[in-house]
A protein has these predicted regions:
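A glycine-rich helix N-cap at a beta->alpha junction
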Residues: 71-90
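Short glycine-enriched loops at secondary-structure junctions
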Residues: 6-12, 59, 100-105, 154
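Active-site glycine-rich loop that binds ribose-phosphate moieties when present
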Residues: 82, 118-143, 151-155
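Extreme N-terminal starter segment of soluble prokaryotic enzymes
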Residues: 1-4
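Glycine-rich loop at the start of a catalytic domain that most often binds anionic cofactors/ligands
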Residues: 60-73
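Active-site rim beta-loop-alpha module in soluble metabolic enzymes
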Residues: 139-201
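Short catalytic helix/loop segments, enriched in acidic residues and glycine
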Residues: 19-43
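C-terminal accessory domains and tails appended to enzymatic cores
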Residues: 189-264
Length: 264
């Protein structure tokens, strides 16, 4: 059984501010915290029956996980400019997806909430407002892989359950404001992630891939109106529908996803 882990950083316990998620005095600590939560998910996946685990480093430069500290049984994709970005490698025949360290969508309550980048105000596909968890789970669905588990703050967990239904979740911290949270004790967090990953993998037959029916209509609202004109001028098929919003339509979900990657 093959399990795929996409790992972000903003939803990791102890991380509450953007300064912790990029190069600076606190960054090495954040990398260690991220690696530990990923390791907990790996341990749980193998305990639940996984025979192979692939981790895709999915935050910013995508060179965050400390490979020498990573569970030796897992392989790692690192580096950015990947065709499927945060979901690179999910097309290689996996049985389930686990999202670690994820966060709420742009504009929603949640610690460091955003959607792929700070320039995005909102993303809608076929009327559904999506964050990274929703979008990436749908990408997995394109390859017939179900989302089985997600970790992050309590708002991320609510967002995931609202869209995907009975997916296993672990809330590692409680949202207070966009830059404040109450994190659970780390030993408790790692124990919970490991146990939940084991449960999710053991019960993997209970999960179904999430798909939306095509054709697909995407609307993206930007924080800065100049980006609307730039996207419409440079990307074939993209149209400005108002001063801050573009649209793109396709019969293929992955085409929509790749256009979003191009503008985010």
């Amino acid at each position: 059984m093959k399990i795929y882990i996409s790992a972000d950083m903003e939803g990791i316990a102890g991380i509450v501010h953007g300064d912790q998620t990029e190069e600076g005095p606190e960054f090495m600590q954040s990398r260690k915290l991220m690696t530990e939560e990923v390791n907990a998910a790996i341990r749980g996946a193998f305990s639940g029956g996984a025979t192979e685990v692939l981790v895709n480093d999915s935050h910013n430069t995508m060179r965050n996980i400390i490979i020498e500290d990573l569970d030796h049984r897992a392989s790692l994709i690192s580096g950015n400019k990947k065709p499927l970005s945060m979901m690179e490698g999910v097309d290689m025949g996996f049985d389930g997806v686990i999202l670690v360290g994820y966060h709420a969508r742009a504009g929603a309550p949640g610690v460091i909430s955003h959607t792929y980048s700070g320039i995005i105000r909102s993303l809608k596909i076929n009327g559904y407002e999506l964050g990274e968890a929703g979008l990436n789970g749908l990408v997995a669905g394109c390859f017939n892989v179900p989302l089985i588990m997600a970790t992050g703050d309590d708002k991320l967990c609510e967002e995931v359950r609202a869209f995907f239904g009975e997916v296993e979740t672990v809330a590692v911290k409680r949202y207070i404001t966009r830059s404040a949270a109450q994190s659970r004790p780390l030993k408790e967090v790692y124990k919970d992630i490991e146990a939940t990953a084991k449960k999710a993998v053991k019960g993997i037959k209970n999960f179904k891939p999430k798909r939306l029916e095509g054709p697909y209509a995407m609307e993206v609202a930007f924080q800065n109106i100049i980006l609307t004109d730039m996207a419409a001028a440079r990307i074939p098929g993209v149209k400005a529908i108002d001063s801050s919003t573009i649209s793109f339509n396709s019969t293929e979900f992955l085409d929509v996803f790749k256009v979003f990657l191009n503008i985010s």
